Amino acid sequence: MARPDLTARLHAQRALRDAQGRRRTRRTVTRRDGVRLEVDGQWLTGFCSNDYLGLAQQFSVVNALQDAAAREGAGAGASHLVCGHHAMHEALEREVAEWLGYPRALLFGSGFAANLAVQQALLSEENDVCVQDKLNHASLLDATRLAGARLRRYPHLDTEGAMRQLKHAPDGAAMLATDGVFSMDGDIAPLRALSLVARLQQALFYVDDAHGVGVVGDGRGAVAAAGLSVDDVPLQLVTLGKALGGSGALVLGRDDLIEHLAETARPYIYTTAVPPAMAAAALEAVRLARRDHWRRTKLTDLIALFRSEARRHGLDLMASETPIQPLLCGDDHTAVAMSTALEQAGWLVGAIRPPTVPEGKARLRVTLSALHTPEQVRGLVEAIANARDRVTLAVREAAPPPLPAFA
């Protein structure tokens, strides 16, 4: 039997994506000014960034990065366990741990690497299992597979389903993992109920709160907003690249768990540390997120305005009170057509299609920032309603005429 040819396979897969209209392409941003982006020579108002608090270009954050780069250079020079753990890394870990009420934190280059590190280091023996929400982020789901553990999934937000899956896997050590805020739906996991499930089933409860920290509750994220602590959620992940406007991620947890990760997690051990200048920028962003409550207040007001205007225009909202506001379109073609129509009108909103979301659940993913104005929010909603009407009319006109009726 002939060995499969990888090049032929990838060409076949690409042809299939072409046929399905699911090719992914990058857009090059030439310049950025707050929520305004220059793309292909056109200035657009963006509603697709994760810069929820508007800190990515904030003056003191950028200044902290520049000052640290002048002192420390462009890179860390080594992995954390060799000689790459700088004072700025330590200061950032301590600040975030103190803010979120955890004993310790461990800094990673990305949330994807951090999720892999947690599962690879902890789910290390045969029959170990990770039980997850079906709509968890790809990095959580992929981490289980890459760690070699068993993956069992429960229906979205279904705590009884989580309990059943844990009961059906009694032989190995168990982890119950969930997003805090779900990145494509914008809803929040029932963390208090899930923490009880984990406790009853002797599973370690792990929350990826990438989209919650800085935004949910008083800014400490979904775990704190649910009234939970390290005793309930022994490990949680927060990213620096969403509300905090930078890059990287931290895993927070009990002393014994963080020490174990530092000593055994391969994505931590075998990679160069984040540049100290990036840690300096993140540290300043954390301090602003803790201090500038007006950013969250304004963001909350903009979310309420968006939902009110969307309902007034009859748009199909999902149940989200976070900056992630998906508008269901159903089929891929409608989502892409509406995104294209919005861009032609001066708005940048991403069309999200399978496999990122389930089949038949293609959507526009609107994300709001404290940098947006009420006028921009109203303008976007009106533009979405106009795009919906245009696309609906085009589909109707392209449909074949009905067959004649017979008596």
From Swiss-Prot:
Cofactor dependence: pyridoxal 5'-phosphate
Any one Gene Ontology molecular-function term assigned to this protein's record: 8-amino-7-oxononanoate synthase activity
UniProt: substrate binding residues: 24, 137, 356
GO annotation (BP), single: biotin biosynthetic process
Organism superkingdom: Bacteria
SUPFAM superfamilies xrefs: PLP-dependent transferases (SSF53383)
Disulphides: none
Reactions accelerated catalytically: 6-carboxyhexanoyl-[ACP] + L-alanine + H(+) = (8S)-8-amino-7-oxononanoate + holo-[ACP] + CO2
Pathway: Cofactor biosynthesis; biotin biosynthesis
Residues noted as binding pyridoxal 5'-phosphate in the record, renumbered to the chain: 111-112, 183, 211, 239
UniProt similarity note: Belongs to the class-II pyridoxal-phosphate-dependent aminotransferase family. BioF subfamily.
Subunit comment: Homodimer.
Role noted for this protein: Catalyzes the decarboxylative condensation of pimeloyl-[acyl-carrier protein] and L-alanine to produce 8-amino-7-oxononanoate (AON), [acyl-carrier protein], and carbon dioxide.
UniProt protein name: 8-amino-7-oxononanoate synthase
Species lineage: Bacteria, Pseudomonadati, Pseudomonadota, Gammaproteobacteria, Lysobacterales
